[in-house]
Amino acid sequence: MIDKKQSSENRRILRIAIPSIISNITVPLLGLIDVTIVGHLGSPAYIGAIAVGGMLFNIIYWIFGFLRMGTSGMTSQAYGQHDLNEITRLLLRSVGVGLFIALCLLILQYPILKLAFTLIQTTPEVEQLATTYFYICIWGAPATLGLYGFAGWFIGMQNSRFPMYIAITQNIVNIVASLSFVYLLDMKVAGVATGTLIAQYAGFFMAILLYMHYYSVLRKRIVWKEIIQKQAMYRFFQVNRDIFFRTLCLVVVTMFFTSAGAAQGEIVLAVNTLLMQLFTLFSYIMDGFAYAGEALAGRYIGAKNQTALRNTVHHLFYWGLGLSLIFTILYAIGGKEFLGLLTNDTSVINASDTYFYWALIIPLAGFSAFLWDGVFIGATATRQMLYSMLVASASFFGVYYAFHPLLGNHALWLAFLIYLSLRGVVQTFLGRQIMKKVIASQ
């Protein structure tokens, strides 16, 4: 009986995690496709323009990722409570807020770009091409931020297949549209940007169609005045405010890591960038299980099922520990060969030997932070998640500035690994208390 229960719980986790992992892997493909297309146009300025423009949108959309996470946690709890009215309101509330933020971005697009180019130094040609790319792609903000709401809502509804279908569709549309505009109409960077824009709206409208077809029964429960009910909106913004500041800390640490590496020279920057690809690859897998944590933790909290909640957390950590060990072994055996696929610059490959062992520690140091983030989002324990991020971020900068004069780039990696580990340690300490309080308050 116990084996059957464990098998059933593992199936629930994998049913959400595997499609989420596939979705995560497709995300960088949009940017990679754009770079590949312009990389054959005959000038490095095109690649630089896509790199700069892509970085701007990555930062902007990363900051507003709370729309997906907050919606996922609250929807999964409503799902566990079988509260169809609140489930319906949460989707419209999230998409509505996303569209409002997108409208603000459209209004402020000129000062945003001006500020960006005061912080980023590029050649005049790259700046001109990046400006073209930005002013086209910014019109995809409503689709992108609206889709964040849908993605979080689908996951909260225990359905990660729809976000996967949407992500795959976006990539196919982007490839076809961008190639057509660039090579048939000779639109160059403008063609790539237009292809990306069309792909974004294709994904958004596909989400609407999936909702209308498979969740049509919920449309009968729409009461517009209840969507902006004061108490519900307060909770919505309270949860998302904490996630926003948590994400801001994440962005600051990530950008500082790149900046600190760049300050130590081109070779160190290149080495750090390559080694971080090992972390990025691992994060795609762990994020899939974090999404499962969001959906299932919220569901069981909504259903007031503390036994199932505890069982899910245990199973998530079994998966996390097992996968971390596998990644550590794989990186130890073939990590350097993987780096060789990313670059043929022998000076960079040789320099990476000095810092490679830091990358080996990443999976074991970081897996618990990913999983607890998912559980905390499902529990809407976002204030505690923010506290853990603040502690970890402060430690990151403290360790770096304390040891950099002695250790150089090793201090940067030491600080990053302590930052990852502390997030997991603090959340582990808070996790049990939070679970009990959340269940008791339901």
Regions found by a protein language model. Give the residues of each.
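Small-residue-rich hydrophobic transmembrane alpha-helices
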Residues: 47-107, 144-162, 271-333, 367-380, ...
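Short alpha-helical transmembrane segments in multi-pass integral membrane proteins
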Residues: 1-17, 75-142, 182-241, 297-362, ...
